[in-house]
Amino acid sequence: MYKHFWQKGRTFYYVSKYGRVYSTTDADSHPATWHLIATYNGKGYRRVRLQGRTFKVHRLVAEAFVPNPDQLPYVLHKDGDRENNRWDNLEWSDRQSNHGGRLNINK
């Protein structure tokens, strides 16, 4: 499953629930023809740059596929692996849980 999340002129951007971000110039094209556009930042997170703004892939996946009924501000990787951006490995969190996860206190 893919969700459209951005459009710049005639370029369309999609995120998959498996953590892949694609661009295409044809909204009706088959996903096999799309281009993977994510890179890594210095901290191990995958990111994309669109119109001068940088977006973390795990956040795009969570916003598209992980419900956030409590409007929590942070996205955690359940298994601690920053490269595992699958929707089922992500959860919304508050600041305290996010900090605790980095220190491995909450495991």
Where are these regions (language model features)?
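Conserved recognition-core residues within compact binding domains
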Residues: 1-74, 79-107
